[in-house]
Amino acid sequence: MKTKIRNIFILAVIIFSKSGFAISYTLDDYTKNPFGNILFVRHALAPGYGDPQNFDLNECSTQRNLNGIGREQAYRIGENIKEAGIKFLKIYSSQWCRCMETAEYMNLGKITVEPGLNSFFQGIMPKEKTLSILRERLKSIEAKQQLVLMVTHQVTITAVTGITVSSGGAVAFNTKSGESKELMILD
């Protein structure tokens, strides 16, 4: 019986370690002991699932967008980051309206559109091409070792870091080591 319990425990540890299970890292922890050079932030709350069938990248009315709670959430994320004294040399966002709006409400600086941060969840964008673009961007940042903010989607964050976060969630990522830590940016 003890062997069976031990084996189940070991299996659980393996599963969680491979599925992106992470110990939370607070903004206070982050400012005291900075980790990585990329901060991935998932767009704030945009009720629903996926995007409508009539999705058009250039037309926000055809996309799933932030609601009032999502806009407030994005604003609070920005305020928390400012209060922690964290500054970014560059801010990138997916082309999706909910990501751009999240970055705008965070109000942390000039936003640059980055197609490598786009969602490939419903096949609207090709996964491999999108991730290839993102990998090239990450390589260019790695060489400079600058702190960069990337506002994107859950599927993109998970594909790069192995960690799944909720709306408004964040992951600190080290482009050199490939390691990542979930960062609690909302109080």
Can you say where each PLM-predicted feature lies in the sequence?
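Active-site-proximal alpha-helix that buttresses catalytic centers in soluble enzyme cores
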Residues: 23-116, 120-123, 163-187
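Bacterial N-terminal signal peptides that target proteins for export
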Residues: 1-9
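A short, acidic, amphipathic alpha-helical segment used as a generic capping/interface helix at domain edges
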Residues: 132-142
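Generic beta-sheet signal
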Residues: 36-38, 146-152
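N-terminal signal peptide c-region/cleavage motif recognized by signal peptidases
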Residues: 17-19
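Glycine-rich phosphate-binding loop signature in dinucleotide/nucleotide-binding domains
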Residues: 84-86, 141-145
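Short, surface-exposed amphipathic charged segments that create phosphate/polyanion-binding patches used
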Residues: 125-133
